[in-house]
Structures are given as structure tokens and as C-alpha cells.
Curated annotation (Swiss-Prot):
Expressed at high levels in leaves, moderate levels in roots, seedlings and stems, and at low levels in flowers, pollen and siliques. Accumulates in leaf guard cells and trichomes. Also present in epidermal cells of roots. Expressed in mature guard cells. Induction: Repressed by the micro RNA miR824. Keywords: Developmental protein, DNA-binding, Flowering, Nucleus, Transcription, Transcription regulation. This is Agamous-like MADS-box protein AGL16.
């Protein structure tokens, strides 16, 4: 359900009126500060509560804002007067010169110079500003260090992963070399076995060949003896 609109009229209840004033006042001052920072505008806000309490905000100094406002209002009434225009720009130059002087003075005080004329409250405010600035510098430095550490961690993880991959490749090459060595050894063993088998078969064949030759040579001697005996038998038969 949408939020209901508040009627723009005086709030009768004093408590509700005070709460609304506090919220709206803080919101207005916050918006004025944001406008001054975002748009580089010179802003001045003056608020008086129903009890007469003063609340104000100025981007530089309230006095310079009021003076500039008065000068601008005076310019509208005499914008066609050349002398008034010259006077206006002279005042603008004086205001800018004053602002530059204030900035230079603040810078020297931030550097720890020209502190002798400051009150305890002013020194406390200066210390608070320095602490805020130092906190911002430390936060930025810590953020940059964290980012650098994250980058280094990512690079370290990549290097570690590359080392793991390289180690796996080395192990794989070693395993392949072992398998190749085993295959070469098997082939050499087969060659040696075949060679031994050939040598053994050669010796057997040579022995068999020698025996065959001996048998062939012995056959004619047997036939010669048989033939001689046959002749002798025929001879004796003839005599008888």
C-alpha cells in the first residue's frame, strides 16, 4: 500500500510538529550540502525554529554568502549602471581573494603551521578534520593493498596450476618412455629368441645331412661285396 501524502498545513500537535521540523531541517541541510559539493555552488541556508533557535549551513562562510546575496540584489536594481557593475566585480574579486586567503590559511594549518593563534575549540576542529582526512587516506591505501593482494593471489594460483599441469605432463612422458622401453625390450627378446631358434635348427639340419651322406656312401660298398660274392658263387658253380 502506498504511502499517504501529508497535507501541507500547520501541524497542531506540538510533538509531531517538532519531530517533523527536526526531520525536514536535517533533510534540507543535507540537500544544501550535497548541492554545494556536487554542483560547486555557493550555498547558504538559515533556519529559525518556532522557539527562535538558529540553524544554518554555508558552503564557505555565511558572511560571504550574505554579502554576495546583498550585492546581487543591489545589482538587479542598478544593472544598467556601469559604475555599479565595476563595483560589483570589485566586490566579487575581493570575495574570491578572501576565499583564497582562507584556503591558504587552512592549508597551512593542516600542515601544522600558524597554530599559535587558534583556540582549543579550533584546534579540536582541526584535529577532527585531520583524523577524517587520515582515515580516508588509510581506507584508500587499504583498499589498494587488498586489490594488489587479490591480484597476486590470482597470479599465484595460475602459476600453481601451471606447475601442476607441467608435472602431469612430465609424469605422462615418463610413463610413455617406460612403456616404450618395455616394448623395445620385448622386441629385442623376440629377436634373440628367434636367432637362437635359427641357430639350433641349423645345427640339427647339419647333423641330419651328415648322416644321410654317410648312408649314401656306405651303400655302394655293400653292393660291391654282394656283387663279389655273386661272382665267386658263379665261379665255383662253373668249376663244379
Amino acid at each position: 500500500m502506498g504511502r499517504g501524502k501529508i497535507a501541507i498545513k500547520r501541524i497542531n500537535n506540538s510533538t509531531s510538529r517538532q519531530v517533523t521540523f527536526s526531520k525536514r531541517r536535517n533533510g534540507l541541510l543535507k540537500k544544501a550540502k550535497e548541492l554545494a559539493i556536487l554542483c560547486d555552488a555557493e550555498v547558504g541556508v538559515i533556519i529559525f525554529s518556532s522557539t527562535g533557535r538558529l540553524y544554518d549551513f554555508s558552503s564557505s562562510s555565511m558572511k560571504s554568502v550574505i554579502e554576495r546575496y546583498s550585492d546581487a540584489k543591489g545589482e538587479t536594481s542598478s544593472e544598467n549602471d556601469p559604475a555599479s557593475e565595476i563595483q560589483f566585480w570589485q566586490k566579487e574579486a575581493a570575495i574570491l581573494k578572501r576565499q583564497l586567503h582562507n584556503l591558504q590559511e587552512n592549508h597551512r594549518q593542516m600542515m601544522g603551521e600558524e597554530l599559535s593563534g587558534l583556540s582549543v575549540e579550533a584546534l579540536q576542529n582541526l584535529e577532527n578534520q585531520l583524523e577524517l582526512s587520515l582515515r580516508g587516506v588509510r581506507m584508500k591505501k587499504d583498499q589498494m593493498l587488498i586489490e594488489e593482494i587479490q591480484v597476486l593471489n590470482r597470479e599465484g594460483n595460475l602459476v600453481h596450476q601451471e606447475n601442476l599441469d607441467l608435472h602431469k605432463k612430465v609424469n605422462l612422458m615418463h610413463q610413455q618412455n617406460m612403456e616404450l622401453h618395455e616394448k623395445v625390450s620385448e622386441v629385442e627378446g623376440v629377436k634373440i629368441a628367434n636367432k637362437n631358434s635359427l641357430l639350433t635348427n641349423g645345427l640339427d639340419m647339419r647333423d641330419t645331412s651328415n648322416e644321410h651322406v654317410h648312408l649314401q656312401l656306405s651303400q655302394p660298398q655293400h653292393d660291391h661285396e654282394t656283387h663279389s660274392k655273386a661272382i665267386q658263387l658263379n665261379y665255383f658253380s662253373f668249376i663244379a
